[in-house]
């Protein structure tokens, strides 16, 4: 075992729990590498903002949901400002200087054969710190935003960028990445989503849902968006047509508790964070 570990290639994923998609994408990539290469590849995931960032970046995971839900204008302002090329260049340089102590510590503690970023804020300053310590170790970016991706995702110096869609691929080329380094790879998904699925009836039975038409309402890992009013509208419509609604609230425990206490007009099933999403999707007629 020690000999295998010594010979294994080491891949380190740079992520942060600002939303559920970044960690999920890293897990999907690590799962695929294990299926393809077994113990020949060892994967590690590092929440770089939480463990190596200074305040307020170190609390980004805790701040993310309140920011998006309660101060969305500020979140949109940040995205808009980051899309201004010169402004973002200044921010990236400032972050490099501001966070260099933690970045150097991360680079020293996590040597690897490949670094993969699955987070928009981890493609510039971390790349700089890693390139200084390991000048020949490749660095890749896998974009986990679907339809569009803000400028922080695009570092023309990375060795490979995997775009989630053709629009993101075009944006990467406009940002200065050479065509040979841009791959149209799509979104990473866990193998369970691609495997053969149970029938809706089988999935509903496994989840102890009633055997009736089912709509599934999702808000991502953090349970974001207008889930509560949408659930109210859907529940009323489905009740009048003999259907049922399942609402997955993710890590938003306040929302889950609130919805679970409500009196619904029909069959409504409320869950928090789940690790069997393929089964829930198989049970649904509408997502």
Predicted region positions:
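A short, glycine/small-residue-rich beta-strand->loop->alpha-helix junction that serves as a flexible
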Residues: 16-25, 225
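Extreme N-terminal starter segment of soluble prokaryotic enzymes
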Residues: 8-12
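Donor-nucleotide binding loops and adjacent catalytic segments primarily
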Residues: 200-205, 209-285
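Structural beta-sheet core signal
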Residues: 13, 45, 141, 217, ...
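A nucleotide-sugar donor-handling region in carbohydrate enzymes
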Residues: 159-221, 250-254
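Short loop/edge segments at beta-strand edges and connector loops
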Residues: 143, 186, 272-274
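Active-site and donor-binding regions of nucleotide-sugar-utilizing enzymes
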Residues: 77-176, 181
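Conserved N-terminal ligand/cofactor-binding loop architecture of enzyme catalytic domains
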Residues: 28-110
């Amino acid at each position: 075992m020690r000999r295998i570990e010594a010979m294994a290639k080491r891949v380190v994923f740079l992520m942060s729990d600002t939303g559920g998609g970044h960690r999920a994408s890293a897990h999907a990539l690590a799962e695929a590498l294990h299926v393809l290469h077994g113990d020949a590849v060892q994967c590690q995931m590092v929440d770089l903002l939480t463990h190596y960032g200074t305040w307020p970046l170190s609390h980004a995971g805790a701040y993310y949901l309140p920011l998006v839900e309660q101060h969305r204008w500020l979140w949109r302002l940040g995205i808009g400002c980051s899309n201004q090329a010169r402004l973002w260049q200044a921010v990236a340089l400032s972050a490099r200087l501001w966070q260099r102590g933690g970045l150097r510590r991360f680079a020293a503690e996590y040597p690897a054969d490949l670094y993969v970023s699955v987070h928009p804020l981890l493609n510039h300053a971390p790349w700089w710190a890693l390139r200084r310590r390991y000048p020949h170790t490749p660095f890749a970016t896998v974009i986990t935003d679907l339809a569009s991706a803000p400028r922080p995702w695009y570092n023309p110096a990375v060795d490979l960028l995997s775009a989630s869609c053709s629009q993101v691929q075009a944006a990467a080329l406009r940002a200065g990445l050479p065509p040979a380094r841009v791959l149209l790879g799509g979104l990473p998904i866990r193998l369970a989503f691609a495997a053969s699925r149970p029938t809706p009836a089988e999935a509903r039975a496994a989840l102890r849902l009633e055997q009736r038409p089912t709509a599934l309402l999702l808000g991502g890992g953090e349970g974001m968006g207008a889930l509560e009013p949408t659930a109210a509208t859907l529940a009323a419509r489905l009740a009048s047509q003999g259907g049922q609604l399942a609402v997955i609230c993710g890590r938003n425990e306040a929302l889950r508790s609130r919805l679970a206490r409500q009196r619904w007009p029909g069959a409504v099933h409320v869950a928090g964070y789940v690790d069997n999403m393929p089964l829930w999707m198989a049970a649904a007629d509408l997502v």
